[in-house]
A protein has these predicted regions:
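Conserved N-terminal alpha-helix of the aminotransferase class I/II PLP-enzyme fold
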Residues: 93-142
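Active-site PLP attachment segment
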Residues: 259-294
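Structural motif of enzymes handling amino- and sulfur-group chemistry
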Residues: 307-323
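N-terminal "arm"/small-domain region of PLP-dependent enzymes with the aminotransferase-like
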Residues: 2-105, 237
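Active-site phosphate-binding strand-loop segment of PLP-dependent enzymes
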Residues: 82, 188-241
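Conserved PLP-anchoring active-site segment centered on the Schiff-base-forming lysine
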Residues: 151-170
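Short, structured coil segments at secondary-structure junctions
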Residues: 179-180, 235, 266
Length: 323
């Protein structure tokens, strides 16, 4: 199978229709934009542009799509993270409709000012009940990406340290960059390497945040959370676990890899994403109430973004009840 994919990648038609997704400035003439535009015109002209293909219905295992040529295809989808099918579950959709009828289309405001509705508080309560820990709270964000961006940049500041697994999701990396903290990387799931990194930091006199994931979106494997948390706490570092791909599907009660590896009470912050198993959109941090209250006020991606729309919020509450 490996030989098959190696040969496929070597074929000129394959390489011709792909392009590096890491954009780099080419100077004042914007050459990189011109290069991309030329490439996109070439692949769309050949009907080979495979990104942003519109779906003609719900995100089900079997989907219908329309290419830019206008041709329609019925396909089996292997790309969705609608793991439990909640995005089109009739009870979830009905709950979203009822919330939409009652609250309207959008929150039309920042959650810190005028965008928090009672249904948002109900979702927060349901999440706390779902995890079942005393003195914990939830801070809601309009996306999982925004949650990582806001939480890391609110917790870490210039002079502090963020330590990331090399396989970290882009939102963790971007949050670390935005924080202006010092960034260090450790080899994927390698706690011996992590310890070497932490030893090099003046851990007694600086704040450290170690970020890892329950299930890594880049590799699809589980984070070695028990050892990562033990080593991190040994050096006084807080640990953020992104459970985006693992909530509702991992752990005896669906509480993620933290539950499965018995570290739920030891992770300092847990990030949840509502666009995967929950079937909606949005995200949150679940942590001690002191932390979540702080994030409500200081996480800029929350403060300066519109709150979750009420319809989606109603659907998310039903997803948790069904789980």
């Amino acid at each position: 199978m490996t030989d098959f994919f190696d040969k496929l990648i070597e074929q000129e038609p394959y390489t011709q229709y792909t392009l590096d997704m890491f954009s780099r400035s080419a100077g004042k003439d914007h050459a990189e934009i011109q290069q991309f535009d030329k490439w996109r015109q070439m692949v769309t002209g050949a009907n080979k542009y495979t990104f942003e293909v519109p779906h003609l219905g719900a995100q089900r295992p079997e989907i219908s799509v329309r290419r830019e040529s206008g041709d329609e295809y019925n396909l089996i989808s292997f790309s969705s993270y609608n793991y439990l099918g909640y995005s089109y579950h009739p009870e979830v959709v009905d709950a979203a409709k009822k919330a939409l009828d009652h609250y309207g289309l959008g929150a039309t405001g920042s959650p810190l000012l005028n965008g928090t509705f009672q249904i948002h508080k109900e979702l927060e309560d349901r999440i706390v009940e779902f995890f079942g820990q005393k003195d914990y709270g939830v801070s809601l964000f309009s996306s999982g990406y925004g949650a990582n961006l806001g939480v890391i940049s609110a917790f870490i500041h210039k002079g502090d340290h963020v330590v990331l697994d090399r396989s970290s999701h882009a939102s963790l990396i971007d949050g670390a960059i935005l924080s202006q903290g010092k960034i260090s990387l450790f080899r994927h799931n390698d706690t011996e390497f992590l310890e070497k990194v932490l030893k090099r930091i003046d851990y007694e006199n600086t704040r450290i945040l170690v970020c890892c994931e329950g299930i890594y979106s880049t590799d699809g494997d589980y984070g070695n959370l028990r050892d990562i948390i033990d080593v991190s706490h040994k050096y006084g570092a807080a640990v953020l676990v992104d459970e985006a791909h693992s909530l509702l599907v991992a752990g005896e009660n669906g509480r993620g890899v933290c539950e499965e590896q018995d570290v739920l009470s030891e992770a300092d912050m847990i990030i949840a994403t509502f666009s995967k198993s929950f079937g909606g959109v949005g995200g949150c941090i679940y942590a001690n109430k002191k932390i979540t209250n702080y994030m409500n006020y200081y996480a800029r991606s929350r403060m300066f973004s519109c709150a979750l729309d009420p319809g989606v919020t109603g659907g998310l509450i039903k997803s948790i009840k069904l789980a």
